[in-house]
Amino acid sequence: MGIRSYQAYPPGTRDGSIVNSKEMVNSKEMIESEPQKVLVRGRHIARGRNHRGIITSRHRGGGHRRLYRMIDFRRDKRDVSGEIKTIEYDPNRNTCICLTNYGDGKKRYILYPHGIEIGNKIISGIEAPISIGNTSPLSTNMPLGASVHNIETRPGRGGQLVRAAGTTAKILAKEGQLVTLKLPSGEIRSLPQKCFATIGQIGNIDANNLKLGKAGSRRWLGKRPSVRGVVMNPIDHPHGGGEGKVPIGRKKPLTPWGHPALGRKSRKRRKYSDTLILRRRMA
């Protein structure tokens, strides 16, 4: 289990839980060390503001200071074997990261695949064997039903799909130049067979069971409070105004900008990938 529940001594920790990295890795060899300096950079936090200081994304700001670990989503070290040296904590995500030492002397961080251990060998290439942590195109000998993550949407672009903690996608079919995948959201879509993907499931399978327990835990993550529109003034929200505790005064709920809040599709119309989506994600 990668989730550890709090004891309910103070009210703030009642029903709260945290991510326990050591239990998630299920290994006594997890390294608690400083990250590699060459693989770390400062992280500019925009706090939900644009270049003029105007809020463009609400409920963001604050949070604990942290350094960003540069993750190798491209896995473009073709046919160069690497060894897992450490499994480290990453404050920027709910899963761990693995420091990989390659045969040419380079070091890179990758996402922690569930079940991998320190000392294991990984490789990326067209002829990479079917093993946890290896990366290869979807067109090679990946069997139907295989679990993959860190999937490219276009060849050479780097992994963009299925990168969250505990997620995985399954290969359903191969036809022509396309491969059909079932994503964690329930969406079924096709991708070019030349796209690379990493074999296995991302660590921390119990990430969806995480409960922060108190408002302060959200503030540590850089998430500010979400205020209901019905308690605002009319100038701030369509639901605002009225004497005392009153209904919203509308037939349907609206966003702060006056658009329908429930049931309206937010996906961009006539997107290039619409033809590749065979079934939309489950709401």
Curated annotation (Swiss-Prot):
Residues 229-274 are annotated as: Disordered. GO terms for biological process: mitochondrial translation. The keyword Plastid applies. Residues 262-271 have a biased composition (Basic residues). The keyword ATP-binding does not apply. It comes from the Eukaryota. Keywords: Plastid, Ribonucleoprotein, Ribosomal protein. One of its GO terms (molecular function) is RNA binding. Pfam families: Ribosomal_L2 (PF00181), Ribosomal_L2_C (PF03947). GO terms for cellular component: mitochondrial large ribosomal subunit; plastid. HAMAP family: Ribosomal_uL2_B. Belongs to the universal ribosomal protein uL2 family. This is Large ribosomal subunit protein uL2c. The lineage of its organism: Eukaryota, Viridiplantae, Streptophyta, Embryophyta, Marchantiophyta.
